[in-house]
Amino acid sequence: MTPLRKTNPLMKLINHSLVDLPAPSNISMWWNLGSLLGTCLVLQIVTGLFLAMHYTPDASMAFSSVAHITRDVNYGWVIRYLHANGASMFFICLFLHIGRGLYYGSFLYLETWNIGIILLLATMATAFMGYVLPWGQMSFWGATVITNLLSAVPYIGTDLVQWVWGGYSVDNATLTRFFTFHFILPFIITALVALHLLFLHETGSNNPLGISSQPDKITFHPYYTTKDILGLFLLLLTLMSLVLFSPDLLGDPDNYIQANPLSTPPHIKPEWYFLFAYAILRSVPNKLGGVLALLLSILILMTIPMLHTAKQQSMMFRPLSQLTYWLWAANLLTLTWIGGQPVSYPFITIGQVTSVLYFITILILVPTASLIENKMLKWT
């Protein structure tokens, strides 16, 4: 008798995606990140839903409603900190997932890669709007500074900012619309994830060697389901350790002070996962130039497939490319550190040098290293 999972239309769909999916036999733990990102997304939607039941998106009550969730709601503090730190885990997995794609040449699957970049932008937008909702000092001033960047758009900039704000400053209208978009975007992200998987399953997964996976495949279940469960346990262990032992480690103390338009915090900075882009923004003295550099720091990922000059897909056997890759990774960490530092010497200079290096590595060093390797291997 044929199993139900192979005959029922709905079960058949799940079966082809999670059970009988042909997967390369040699994919490493770096391929676990997709399932971890799915777990993070589900966790964020569930915890966010419970938070939305108790949160009040009103400028006069938002801060108090978050305090009420933390103090009075049954396990409200767990839900709140799971949601806040879950976002951090989401971005850690996201950055590692992109890093894996860059290292092993997964960007050559163009549709999957481009939808992935759209997913990154949508996730960043969602996280930014979520950071505004507690209506603390850093929420308010972060929203003011980042939305104000739209004023750099020539001619229509000022009107654009006031349109986003819903007034002449960040106020109740801004908070309400940010809550609305923060609520709806995760569901749009879920739809994009389905598209991402649809295109991935058209080509099949890449593998560490960067060679065809067709000759040697195994079923996703039980081999990779077991492997994914191990990754899941490690993720939950890290997340619960953060939530239960040090829930405010990645947050900002200023956000425990209610938003006050008349008092500016000494150092306005976004959440840690935006610091690299914030550092690039601050490194350019011109406002419009800074905004363009900020956008390009993410959108440059779309040019990676065009800059691929190597004859091999993966970096596994390309030592020069590996060197440039790890230089870029170290540079990214330096930018993250710089983004959290005050705007003073020597941080300004370090920020400018690392920002220039960020673009030079991607646009010049990696393609050049690949061409040299082609010559060395006599593959030209």
From Swiss-Prot:
CDD domains associated with the record: cytochrome_b_C (cd00290), Cytochrome_b_N (cd00284)
The keyword Membrane is annotated on this UniProt entry: yes
GO molecular function: metal ion binding; ubiquinol-cytochrome-c reductase activity
Transmembrane segments: 33-53, 77-98, 113-133, 178-198, 226-246, 288-308, 320-340, 347-367
Binding site for heme b b562: 83, 182
Reported cofactor(s): heme b
SUPFAM superfamilies cross-referenced by the UniProt entry: a domain/subunit of cytochrome bc1 complex (Ubiquinol-cytochrome c reductase) (SSF81648), Transmembrane di-heme cytochromes (SSF81342)
GO biological process, one term: mitochondrial electron transport, ubiquinol to cytochrome c
Binding sites annotated in the UniProt record for a ubiquinone: 201
GO CC terms: mitochondrial inner membrane; respiratory chain complex III
Keywords tagged on the record: Electron transport, Heme, Iron, Membrane, Metal-binding, Mitochondrion, Mitochondrion inner membrane, Respiratory chain, Transmembrane, Transmembrane helix, Transport, Ubiquinone
Domain of life: Eukaryota
Topology with respect to the bilayer: Multi-pass membrane protein
Manner of cofactor binding, per the entry note: Binds 2 heme b groups non-covalently.
Subunit structure: The cytochrome bc1 complex contains 11 subunits: 3 respiratory subunits (MT-CYB, CYC1 and UQCRFS1), 2 core proteins (UQCRC1 and UQCRC2) and 6 low-molecular weight proteins (UQCRH/QCR6, UQCRB/QCR7, UQCRQ/QCR8, UQCR10/QCR9, UQCR11/QCR10 and a cleavage product of UQCRFS1). This cytochrome bc1 complex then forms a dimer.
Additional remarks: Heme 1 (or BL or b562) is low-potential and absorbs at about 562 nm, and heme 2 (or BH or b566) is high-potential and absorbs at about 566 nm.
Family the UniProt entry places it in: Belongs to the cytochrome b family.
Name of the protein: Cytochrome b
Protein's organism: Nomascus leucogenys
